[in-house]
């Protein structure tokens, strides 16, 4: 977090597992809040609820869900990011999303389409969110997932989706050649690129978001990369921040003000 702050970042996304690890190390909520305050940082996103469409959810998943709700209350975060690896029909998935949204109450459930998941693209993502018909059911747009789902960076992909149904965006970049389909998730979890340093899709992606009139709760930089991280936290934070800033200065300078 200190490296992120020093690089220029204003906030962080926090996973439920990371929060629980902090508690397990002996920290209390007040301690975590004090650390954030000391470094002038805030939590802007909470994640990651999965397996929410299971007919019989495990207690682990139920507990994790409640932890996410608590984290939103603690850190004053409006949204929880969610994914779904299992593949079900639109109708069934929408029903389970509706139930999750009801449990979430005032918090927004941000559904993230991922090409190797049960919600692989924006088309199915919107079909599910639309059918769920909940005010707090929305979508997340991620550059890497977008490109690897073979979606053109074009407004036509989201022409039927209201701008206010996109809750946040996550930006990064991709290699020209994807991993094989069977191991595509490995690329997602280990080999992403900083914005503007791959095939160069990030600026166009951000411009598309701007032109659509989307007002994201958060613009996250999600660069999961073993190679970048191997160079150290300070390098990773500076490298991703500097390249993100370049992209935003080109595509959407207003958000930097």
Question: Which residues does each PLM region occupy?
Answer:
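Histidine-acidic metal/acid-base catalytic patches
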Residues: 1-8, 73-76, 105, 122-141, ...
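Short, conserved active-site loops that position catalytic residues or coordinate cofactors/metal ions
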Residues: 7-17, 45-50
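Residues that cap or flank secondary-structure elements
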Residues: 23-24, 60, 92, 117, ...
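Conserved beta-strand positions in the central sheet of alpha/beta enzyme cores
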Residues: 13, 45-47, 81, 110, ...
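Short catalytic/ligand-binding loop motif for oxyanion handling, primarily in non-cytosolic enzymes
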Residues: 22, 89, 118, 178, ...
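Active-site acidic/histidine proton-transfer and metal-coordination neighborhood
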Residues: 35-42, 52-139, 203, 232-235, ...
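Glycine-rich, proline-tolerant flexible connector loops at the mouths of alpha/beta enzymes
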Residues: 13-37, 87
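Active-site-proximal loop/turn and secondary-structure-junction residues that shape catalytic pockets
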Residues: 16-18, 49-52, 79, 84-88, ...
